[in-house]
Amino acid sequence: MPRIPNVIEGAYLQDILEQPDAMRRTTQSLAGAPFLSADLLSLCTKNAVERIVLTGMGSSFHALHPLHIRLTLAGHFCTMVETSEALHYLPDLFSKNTLTVAVSQSGESAEIVRLLCDGYLKGPIVGITNTPNSTLARLSNLTILTEAGPESTVTCKTYLAGLQALHWLGAIFLNEKLTLTAQHLEDAASEVERYLGQWMAHTASLQNELEGIEQIFITGRGYSLATAGTGGLIMKESTRSPAEGLSSAAFRHGPMEMLSSRVLACICLGDSKTASLNQRLYEEAHKARAKALLIGSGSDHPACTLPDCPAPLLPILEILPVQMLSLALAARLGFEAGNFALASKITATE
């Protein structure tokens, strides 16, 4: 058996390993803001809010999927749109009776800054960011700060902290018991810590799955669309290699024809509503002689086996095997994962 290359350790790996602490800090911060619920209710009542627009770019956009589902199922008129598309093609979304929820880890993304500074907003805005003095934090009517701490390159701990903040916001909208919400977030942090305790074994086992692979797909449905979108993004960003994140349904409408021994399909099992559909896609990928990994509680691969959790929190756990895969692929290619050559941490240009 050929020698398995060692992961070249750097800032990205350190940020990944810091995720449990970042999550715990964020949970404590959210639970320590007793007036947040009242402030949100006041903001919605004062502005006679009739519609909610969820917006962001990159992983901040993908992280909105669980909240979009939860709010829509609860009867809220809710739209999810990339900020750039909204600015150029759907500016009328931001009417005076619309509450905008904008997510940006830096709070300085070009599109978010334009949204705030160029007169698009007619109604109130809730900003979720990791940066206290950012444009988003300063100009939002209500700001929810995550406590991920500084992050060097590829999004990881800020993404998980953002998912937590969005889950908390959803719990407020749905009038759920926040003590229980806090406990679920604490439990998720413990599971992340337990998983990352085996990071070296996980990356080593995933390197074996990458032999001869030229293309990676990451798929999911429902809440797991957050994982598919962010997973494809961070694989490209951290390894400079072709990877695509899309829904499992969209994968059947064309990309499935690409299945071969040179393709790795990472399929999120997801929640009970569509788990059987994702399981069937996984089995069909194997029959097509592609390499396939099932991410979830029913996986037969140790690095992809995850515990059960509330469905809206699945993306917090599902992204961990993708992070390990990015470390494994970069190691095979002989460079440090997440070491930017062309990109920068903050996308300041549209």
Predicted features along the sequence, with ranges:
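Short, charged low-complexity linear motifs
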Residues: M1-I4, E237
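A cross-family phosphate/adenosyl-ligand binding-site feature
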Residues: R3-A22, V126, P150-Y159, L306-I319
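Active-site phosphate/pyrophosphate-binding segments
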Residues: A11-V53, L142-L145, G149-L264, G334-E350
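Glycine-rich phosphate-binding loops that contact phosphosugars or nucleotide phosphates
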Residues: L43-S190, R221, L264, C268-P312, ...
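Residues at alpha-helix termini
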Residues: L73, E237, K287, A331-R332
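Composition- and surface-driven signal marking solvent-exposed, interaction-prone regions
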Residues: G231, N278-L281, E318, A341
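Peripheral docking tails and interdomain loops at the edges
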Residues: T305-E350
